[in-house]
Amino acid sequence: MKLNVSFPATGCQKLFEVVDEHKLRIFYEKRMGAEVEADQLGDEWKGYVLRIAGGNDKQGFPMKQGVLTNSRVRLLMSKGHSCYRPRRDGERKRKSVRGCIVDANLSVLALVIVRKGEQEIPGLTDGNVPRRLGPKRASKIRKLFNLSKEDDVRRYVVKRLLPAKEGKENAKPRYKAPKIQRLVTPVVLQRRRHRLALKKKRLAKRKQSENDYAKLLAQRKKESKVRRQEELKRRRSASMRDSKSSDKSAPQK
Protein backbone atom coordinates (compact mmCIF):
# COMPACT_ATOMS: atom_id res chain seq x y z
CA MET A 1 0.00 0.00 0.00
CA LYS A 2 1.15 3.55 -0.74
CA LEU A 3 0.93 6.29 1.89
CA ASN A 4 0.44 9.83 0.59
CA VAL A 5 1.56 11.92 3.56
CA SER A 6 1.17 15.72 3.66
CA PHE A 7 2.45 18.27 6.16
CA PRO A 8 0.36 21.49 6.07
CA ALA A 9 2.95 23.47 8.06
CA THR A 10 5.50 23.26 5.22
CA GLY A 11 3.12 22.67 2.30
CA CYS A 12 5.01 19.50 1.30
CA GLN A 13 3.66 16.05 0.55
CA LYS A 14 5.42 12.79 -0.23
CA LEU A 15 4.41 9.32 -1.35
CA PHE A 16 5.79 6.35 0.62
CA GLU A 17 5.40 2.73 -0.47
CA VAL A 18 5.09 0.29 2.43
CA VAL A 19 5.47 -3.39 1.53
CA ASP A 20 5.40 -4.85 5.05
CA GLU A 21 1.79 -5.69 5.91
CA HIS A 22 2.50 -5.69 9.66
CA LYS A 23 3.41 -1.99 9.63
CA LEU A 24 0.08 -1.11 8.01
CA ARG A 25 -2.04 -2.88 10.62
CA ILE A 26 -2.12 0.28 12.76
CA PHE A 27 -4.44 1.83 10.13
CA TYR A 28 -6.79 -1.14 9.68
CA GLU A 29 -10.35 -0.84 11.05
CA LYS A 30 -9.79 2.89 11.58
CA ARG A 31 -12.18 5.47 10.14
CA MET A 32 -11.49 8.60 8.14
CA GLY A 33 -10.62 11.42 10.52
CA ALA A 34 -9.09 9.10 13.11
CA GLU A 35 -5.64 10.00 14.48
CA VAL A 36 -3.03 7.23 14.57
CA GLU A 37 0.42 7.15 16.19
CA ALA A 38 2.93 6.27 13.46
CA ASP A 39 5.74 4.81 15.61
CA GLN A 40 5.24 1.36 14.07
CA LEU A 41 6.09 2.59 10.55
CA GLY A 42 9.78 2.99 11.41
CA ASP A 43 12.31 4.78 13.60
CA GLU A 44 12.07 8.02 11.63
CA TRP A 45 8.31 8.16 12.37
CA LYS A 46 8.76 8.09 16.14
CA GLY A 47 6.50 10.64 17.84
CA TYR A 48 4.50 11.43 14.69
CA VAL A 49 0.68 11.44 14.80
CA LEU A 50 -1.15 11.02 11.47
CA ARG A 51 -4.78 11.73 10.62
CA ILE A 52 -6.51 9.55 8.01
CA ALA A 53 -7.80 11.91 5.31
CA GLY A 54 -9.05 9.40 2.72
CA GLY A 55 -7.84 6.96 0.12
CA ASN A 56 -8.54 4.97 -3.02
CA ASP A 57 -8.96 1.25 -3.54
CA LYS A 58 -7.17 -0.82 -6.18
CA GLN A 59 -9.84 -0.05 -8.79
CA GLY A 60 -9.60 3.71 -8.13
CA PHE A 61 -12.84 4.23 -6.20
CA PRO A 62 -12.47 6.88 -3.45
CA MET A 63 -13.31 6.57 0.23
CA LYS A 64 -16.34 8.60 1.37
CA GLN A 65 -16.79 10.02 4.84
CA GLY A 66 -19.92 8.84 6.66
CA VAL A 67 -20.28 5.48 4.86
CA LEU A 68 -19.64 3.07 7.74
CA THR A 69 -18.36 0.04 5.85
CA ASN A 70 -15.05 -1.26 4.53
CA SER A 71 -16.53 -2.43 1.21
CA ARG A 72 -17.81 -0.71 -1.90
CA VAL A 73 -21.36 0.66 -2.14
CA ARG A 74 -23.39 2.48 -4.79
CA LEU A 75 -24.95 5.73 -3.60
CA LEU A 76 -27.33 8.15 -5.30
CA MET A 77 -25.45 11.46 -5.27
CA SER A 78 -26.38 15.03 -6.09
CA LYS A 79 -24.77 18.46 -5.94
CA GLY A 80 -22.88 19.04 -2.70
CA HIS A 81 -21.85 15.42 -2.12
CA SER A 82 -18.18 14.54 -2.04
CA CYS A 83 -16.82 12.16 -4.71
CA TYR A 84 -19.30 13.55 -7.27
CA ARG A 85 -19.34 16.55 -9.61
CA PRO A 86 -22.67 17.15 -11.41
CA ARG A 87 -22.48 17.93 -15.13
CA ARG A 88 -25.96 19.48 -15.35
CA ASP A 89 -28.20 21.47 -13.01
CA GLY A 90 -30.13 19.21 -10.65
CA GLU A 91 -28.47 16.07 -11.97
CA ARG A 92 -28.32 13.03 -9.68
CA LYS A 93 -26.30 9.90 -10.33
CA ARG A 94 -25.60 6.60 -8.64
CA LYS A 95 -21.84 6.26 -8.10
CA SER A 96 -19.64 3.58 -6.59
CA VAL A 97 -17.67 4.70 -3.53
CA ARG A 98 -15.74 2.95 -0.82
CA GLY A 99 -16.66 3.14 2.86
CA CYS A 100 -14.73 5.25 5.36
CA ILE A 101 -13.17 2.25 7.18
CA VAL A 102 -9.61 1.31 6.19
CA ASP A 103 -8.77 -2.26 5.18
CA ALA A 104 -6.13 -4.12 3.14
CA ASN A 105 -7.85 -3.58 -0.24
CA LEU A 106 -6.76 0.05 -0.53
CA SER A 107 -3.97 1.02 -2.92
CA VAL A 108 -3.36 4.58 -1.62
CA LEU A 109 -4.06 6.01 1.82
CA ALA A 110 -4.00 9.79 2.30
CA LEU A 111 -2.56 10.93 5.65
CA VAL A 112 -1.97 14.34 7.25
CA ILE A 113 0.68 14.99 9.90
CA VAL A 114 -1.08 16.32 12.99
CA ARG A 115 1.91 16.27 15.34
CA LYS A 116 5.55 16.31 14.30
CA GLY A 117 7.92 13.77 15.81
CA GLU A 118 11.53 13.84 16.95
CA GLN A 119 13.30 13.38 13.61
CA GLU A 120 13.00 15.20 10.30
CA ILE A 121 11.65 13.28 7.30
CA PRO A 122 13.54 14.20 4.10
CA GLY A 123 11.31 15.83 1.48
CA LEU A 124 8.41 16.24 3.90
CA THR A 125 9.33 18.18 7.03
CA ASP A 126 12.76 19.60 6.18
CA GLY A 127 11.71 21.71 3.16
CA ASN A 128 9.23 24.51 2.72
CA VAL A 129 7.00 25.08 -0.32
CA PRO A 130 5.65 28.66 -0.30
CA ARG A 131 2.09 29.20 -1.39
CA ARG A 132 1.84 30.40 -4.96
CA LEU A 133 -1.17 32.65 -4.32
CA GLY A 134 -1.90 34.90 -1.36
CA PRO A 135 -5.33 35.76 0.07
CA LYS A 136 -7.69 37.70 -2.19
CA ARG A 137 -10.43 38.80 0.22
CA ALA A 138 -9.82 41.97 2.25
CA SER A 139 -10.82 40.40 5.58
CA LYS A 140 -8.47 37.44 4.98
CA ILE A 141 -5.55 39.82 4.25
CA ARG A 142 -6.34 41.70 7.49
CA LYS A 143 -6.38 38.43 9.40
CA LEU A 144 -3.07 37.28 7.88
CA PHE A 145 -1.18 40.49 8.70
CA ASN A 146 -3.14 41.31 11.89
CA LEU A 147 -4.38 44.65 10.51
CA SER A 148 -7.04 46.92 11.93
CA LYS A 149 -9.92 48.43 9.94
CA GLU A 150 -8.06 51.73 9.64
CA ASP A 151 -5.01 50.18 7.90
CA ASP A 152 -4.76 50.24 4.11
CA VAL A 153 -5.09 46.65 2.87
CA ARG A 154 -3.75 47.44 -0.61
CA ARG A 155 -0.19 47.83 0.67
CA TYR A 156 -0.19 44.27 2.05
CA VAL A 157 -1.35 42.35 -1.04
CA VAL A 158 0.86 39.32 -1.75
CA LYS A 159 2.36 39.89 -5.20
CA ARG A 160 3.92 37.33 -7.51
CA LEU A 161 7.04 38.04 -9.56
CA LEU A 162 6.51 37.27 -13.24
CA PRO A 163 9.38 35.62 -15.14
CA ALA A 164 11.26 37.92 -17.50
CA LYS A 165 10.63 37.54 -21.24
CA GLU A 166 13.37 36.42 -23.60
CA GLY A 167 15.66 39.29 -24.51
CA LYS A 168 14.26 41.51 -21.74
CA GLU A 169 16.22 40.18 -18.77
CA ASN A 170 17.40 43.69 -17.82
CA ALA A 171 13.90 45.16 -17.91
CA LYS A 172 12.05 46.30 -14.83
CA PRO A 173 10.63 43.34 -12.87
CA ARG A 174 6.89 42.84 -13.29
CA TYR A 175 4.57 41.68 -10.53
CA LYS A 176 1.09 40.24 -10.61
CA ALA A 177 -1.33 40.89 -7.74
CA PRO A 178 -4.90 39.68 -7.23
CA LYS A 179 -7.80 42.10 -7.29
CA ILE A 180 -8.91 42.61 -3.70
CA GLN A 181 -12.52 41.59 -3.12
CA ARG A 182 -14.89 43.12 -0.53
CA LEU A 183 -12.64 46.17 -0.19
CA VAL A 184 -14.52 49.15 1.26
CA THR A 185 -13.52 52.28 -0.69
CA PRO A 186 -15.21 55.70 -1.12
CA VAL A 187 -16.57 54.55 -4.49
CA VAL A 188 -18.15 51.47 -2.86
CA LEU A 189 -19.73 53.65 -0.16
CA GLN A 190 -21.00 56.05 -2.84
CA ARG A 191 -22.59 53.15 -4.75
CA ARG A 192 -24.16 51.90 -1.54
CA ARG A 193 -25.62 55.35 -0.82
CA HIS A 194 -26.85 55.57 -4.42
CA ARG A 195 -28.56 52.17 -4.13
CA LEU A 196 -30.22 53.19 -0.85
CA ALA A 197 -31.37 56.48 -2.40
CA LEU A 198 -32.86 54.61 -5.38
CA LYS A 199 -34.55 52.18 -3.00
CA LYS A 200 -36.09 55.03 -0.99
CA LYS A 201 -37.17 56.72 -4.21
CA ARG A 202 -38.87 53.53 -5.43
CA LEU A 203 -40.55 53.12 -2.04
CA ALA A 204 -41.88 56.69 -2.07
CA LYS A 205 -43.08 56.28 -5.67
CA ARG A 206 -44.83 53.02 -4.80
CA LYS A 207 -46.56 54.61 -1.79
CA GLN A 208 -47.64 57.57 -3.93
CA SER A 209 -48.98 55.19 -6.59
CA GLU A 210 -50.87 53.20 -3.93
CA ASN A 211 -52.40 56.40 -2.50
CA ASP A 212 -53.37 57.65 -5.97
CA TYR A 213 -54.93 54.29 -6.79
CA ALA A 214 -56.82 54.23 -3.48
CA LYS A 215 -58.17 57.76 -4.14
CA LEU A 216 -59.18 56.85 -7.70
CA LEU A 217 -60.86 53.66 -6.47
CA ALA A 218 -62.80 55.60 -3.80
CA GLN A 219 -63.85 58.17 -6.41
CA ARG A 220 -64.98 55.44 -8.83
CA LYS A 221 -66.96 53.73 -6.05
CA LYS A 222 -68.60 57.02 -5.10
CA GLU A 223 -69.50 57.76 -8.74
CA SER A 224 -70.86 54.23 -9.15
CA LYS A 225 -72.93 54.62 -5.98
CA VAL A 226 -74.35 57.98 -7.17
CA ARG A 227 -75.18 56.50 -10.59
CA ARG A 228 -76.89 53.52 -8.97
CA GLN A 229 -78.92 55.76 -6.68
CA GLU A 230 -79.99 57.91 -9.64
CA GLU A 231 -80.90 54.78 -11.60
CA LEU A 232 -82.99 53.45 -8.70
CA LYS A 233 -84.67 56.85 -8.27
CA ARG A 234 -85.47 57.00 -11.98
CA ARG A 235 -86.89 53.47 -11.97
CA ARG A 236 -88.96 54.22 -8.88
CA SER A 237 -90.44 57.37 -10.42
CA ALA A 238 -91.11 55.51 -13.70
CA SER A 239 -92.90 52.69 -11.87
CA MET A 240 -95.00 55.23 -9.91
CA ARG A 241 -96.02 56.93 -13.18
CA ASP A 242 -96.96 53.58 -14.69
CA SER A 243 -99.09 52.65 -11.68
CA LYS A 244 -100.93 56.02 -11.75
CA SER A 245 -101.66 55.75 -15.46
CA SER A 246 -102.97 52.20 -15.04
CA ASP A 247 -105.27 53.35 -12.22
CA LYS A 248 -106.72 56.12 -14.42
CA SER A 249 -107.28 53.86 -17.41
CA ALA A 250 -109.05 51.18 -15.37
CA PRO A 251 -112.96 51.12 -16.03
CA GLN A 252 -115.14 52.29 -13.13
CA LYS A 253 -118.14 50.15 -12.08
Swiss-Prot record:
Alphabetized Pfam families for the sequence: Ribosomal_S6e
GO BP field: ribosomal small subunit biogenesis; translation
Domain of life of the native organism: Eukaryota
Mod. after translation: Ribosomal protein S6 is the major substrate of protein kinases in eukaryote ribosomes.
SMART domains: Ribosomal_S6e
Any one Gene Ontology molecular-function term assigned to this protein's record: structural constituent of ribosome
Function (record text): Component of the 40S small ribosomal subunit. Plays an important role in controlling cell growth and proliferation through the selective translation of particular classes of mRNA. Part of the small subunit (SSU) processome, first precursor of the small eukaryotic ribosomal subunit.
Listed name of the protein: Small ribosomal subunit protein eS6
Species this protein is from: Spodoptera frugiperda (Fall armyworm)
